[in-house]
């Protein structure tokens, strides 16, 4: 689902104009992004939590030349932990019916 798909679905169920819904959705995403960029976590009850984590520096390997090591510096990443309701709903899925996009 894309942002546009989300806007259309919300507009249909709420009978609001798509342009108004798009503005609210975009503003919501902008605020979430800004809070995370300031190092703040975000919690949506029953949905999940966005957290800022620091990955420690480590040594990696070049897959094309396994004998060559590469230093990977520490970095800040966003981690999402699904809430109880989302976890339970996803667990109800039939694994055979899930279409996975492998990026190809």
Language-model segments: which ranges?
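Strongly charged
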Residues: 1-104
């Amino acid at each position: 689902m894309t942002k546009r798909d989300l806007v259309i679905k919300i507009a249909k169920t709420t009978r609001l104009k798509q342009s108004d819904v798009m503005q609210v959705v975009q503003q919501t995403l902008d605020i979430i992004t800004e809070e995370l960029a300031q190092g703040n976590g975000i919690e949506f009850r029953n949905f999940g939590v966005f957290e800022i984590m620091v990955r420690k520096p480590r040594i990696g390997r070049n897959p094309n030349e396994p004998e060559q090591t590469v230093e990977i510096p520490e970095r800040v990443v966003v981690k999402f932990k699904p809430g109880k309701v989302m976890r339970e709903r996803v667990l109800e899925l039939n694994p055979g019916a899930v279409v996975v996009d492998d990026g190809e």
